[in-house]
Every structure is written in C-alpha cells, then in structure tokens.
Amino acid sequence: MLTYKQRQSLNHAICDYVRQNEGSDELLVQLESVLLPNGSDVIPQDPNLLERKWNSIVRLQSKIMELEKNCEELQKSIDEQQSSTNQISNASSDWCPRDTPSFQITLDASITALCLHPSLPIIFIGLDSGKLLRYDILNVELPLQSTMAHMDGITSISISLPNENGRPAYLATTSKDLNTKIWELELDSTLSHIKTLAGHEHTVSDCQFFERGADLLLATCSRDLYLKIWDISNGWCIKSFQPHTQWIRSLHVHGEFVLTGSNDSAIRLTHWPSGNGLSMGIGHDFPVEKVLILIPDPQHLQPQYQPLGFQHVASASRDGTIRLWKVSLPKFIPHRPPRPNPLDTTFKVIAVLTDHNSWVRDLRQFNDMLFSCSDDGSVKCWSLDWTNLSTTTCKKSWDLSNKGFQNCLTLDNIAFTGLPSRKLLFSGSSEGTLTSFMR
C-alpha cells in the first residue's frame, strides 16, 4: 500500500505526463478531478532536491556507479603519477647531461652570471654590459624581459623563495658598479626593482640569499675586502668583517658559517654572526675563483660534524685545479660562538683535480656530482664518492671552446629549494653564448 504522499506524488506525475505529452484539456481536467481532488495539498517539488519518482532509485544507483568509476580512474592516475615521480627522482640522482647541447643562443655581451628559477622554466642571465635578461627556456626566440640593471657588468645573481607568511620571492644582482640590487619577483617571474644596497667601496663579486629563522638575509663580498650581511626587510647591513687580506671573489653560506675564496689564494671558514675565523685552506698557487660547500647525504655526514652541517668543501682556482678539502672541526662551546681549534686550523686536501687546462671559473653540485667550467672552454662533470673523495674522477666532459671561455654555470639547487630536481644545466661564455643541456 502507498502512503498518502506517495499516492499524491504518483497522481501528480500522471497528470504531468499527460500535460507534457499535449493531452487534451478535457482529459487533463477529468484526471485532475479524479486523481487530485485536493490539488492544493500537493507540495511543489523543490528543483534542488532529487526527484521523488519511481525511477529515482535507478538514477541514484547509476550515479553511484559513475562516481565509483571516477574514483577508480583518479586513484589510478595518482598511482601512475607517484610512480613517475619516483622514477624521475631516481633518474635525477645519477643524471648526467646529454653529449650535445639542446640549444644555444648568442647575446650581445659576455655572460657573467646565471640563475635558474627554482620552479618555473625561467632563467635569469647577467651580462658584462650590466643588462639583466629573463628567458623562457622553452621558447628562447626573444627574452621575456630585458632590463639595464647596472651601470657596469653583473657579477652574480641569487634567488630566494616566497614563504608562508606572504613574503614574496626576490632576486639579487651584484655588479662592478659597487652596488647590490634587490628585485621582487611577481608570480609570472616579472622583475621589479625595490631597493639598492650601497655600502661596498669596490666591485661586489658574489652574493647569496639565506634564511635565519623568519628573516631573509643576503651575504655579499667585495674587492674592498669586506663580507657583509644584509637584512632584506629593511636593507640594513647587520654584519661586516674582513676574512681576507685581498679581493674576496666568492662566498658560500651554510647556516651560521660562510666559506670564502680570495685573491690571496686561500679559502677561509668563518662563523659570520660573531666574525670568528675558524679555519683555512692553503694550497692554490693563484687566486681562488669559486668556493663551494659540499652537502652530502645525511648518512655520509660524520657525527662530530653534525653541528657544522658539512665536512667537505671545494675550491676552483686560476691555477687550473679544483681542490677538495676536509674542513678542520672548530671547537663548539655551549652558549658561545664556535672558536678555532688551536690544534687543527688548516683544511686537509683530499683530492686535486687537474683535468682543466686553464682558469676554473665556476663550480656547482648536483647530488653526487660536481660540475665545473673553465677558460679552456670545457664543462666537466665529476663523480663524488662520499666514502672516499680522493677517488673523484671526471665522469664526462663537453668541449665548448668554439664559443669562448666558459664563465659560469647554473642548475637546480636542490638543497636550497627542496623542490623536485630538473634535468637542466646551463653554461654562459665570454662570447655571449648560452648553452643548454636539457635531459
């Protein structure tokens, strides 16, 4: 037996059916008088609710089956994506660029600095003319943006990431014009100049963004012998000291420690908040062009080096060599800044790599590989064995000498960004040629 509401719904459906199929008015009046004697008792159907008709159960079952199918397809897609991500990650850990370049573009001045955007297919290029270019690496016919950033050559570029508190991404450029400029990156990577950091009295050689707590800081070094730490929020210099007696050409910051290389042919490790010099490496015959703190997998870091966060560094020099060093461990005293160990203040040379035939200009780490470029026109890839760095050998070499001296390199800085690594390597030459190796 049907309930009253069910009978009313059935009767109303019959009348609707006759009406929609153009039944005669006389028939419709007769049906309504018999089936719906109290038409006002019928509550109108809410269009936002599921229809209460006899086929509603069938429709509901069909909808359930459709949703289940969609869920299965989505789960399959997620599983495939995770599998693909794992394959990319595994492939990237031992990735080595192809034998031939993916593309080359020639610009109107020597390329002196390169920097990849950590997530977008964008590369920033600094020229010796002071021009800053922004290119889409998937379409390099024309630059996305060209800015005369400095009055003299750009020497380095560093990029920072936005944070959860709304801080935007920034780009820093240093130059021979004695200035460091800070640029804000919009969501589409468009550059807007926001401030100039003036304080150095000679060429600013290198820079690097790094975080300390919630603060974004920038380290710069210069031919005026000073290394400076800047607070980006207000543009103030919060620390300034002299780690070397000659031109500081390169720096690399890791936490509270900064590694520097100089024209005095030495490299030094300093605790920058206190300015305490901790140890140094002596062995190069000519000025040091580039220094790099080597970040190993956590399992390869010895327990006593945990407070430092690393135990090996690399340096590239005009003597044509790359040296791998083991850092002497400073003394860590609770509630005090670290101090040099009086019994061990000198780095130990682990390996001297001599495959380059001229000045070695730049160094970059990619997982267990070290990339270098030189005035001999070559780019080289070195295989790092963390258990025995003395066995480091050249894994692959690319001869780009027909494009001039190779001044600089860039690839994804995995340790800094924490983002998935991409199979990208770029080299910039003295003749203005950007060479790309993709996959």
UniProtKB/Swiss-Prot annotation:
Keyword Coiled coil found: yes
Domain of life: Eukaryota
PROSITE patterns assigned: WD_REPEATS_1 (PS00678), WD_REPEATS_2 (PS50082), WD_REPEATS_REGION (PS50294)
UniProt keyword annotation of Repeat present: yes
Xref: Pfam families: WD40
GO MF term list: dynein complex binding
Keywords noted in UniProt: Cell cycle, Cell division, Coiled coil, Cytoplasm, Cytoskeleton, Microtubule, Mitosis, Repeat, Transport, WD repeat
WD-type repeats, residues: 106-145, 149-193, 199-240, 243-282, 295-335, 355-392, 402-438
Coiled coil: 55-90
Gene Ontology BP terms: cell division; establishment of mitotic spindle orientation; microtubule sliding
Subcellular location: Cytoplasm, Cytoskeleton; Cytoplasm, Cytoskeleton, Spindle pole
Family (UniProt): Belongs to the WD repeat LIS1/nudF family.
Role, per record: Positively regulates the activity of the minus-end directed microtubule motor protein dynein. Plays a central role in positioning the mitotic spindle at the bud neck during cell division. Targets cytoplasmic dynein to microtubule plus ends, thereby promoting dynein-mediated microtubule sliding along the bud cortex and consequently the movement of the mitotic spindle to the bud neck.
The protein, known as: Nuclear distribution protein PAC1
Organism lineage: Eukaryota, Fungi, Dikarya, Ascomycota, Saccharomycotina
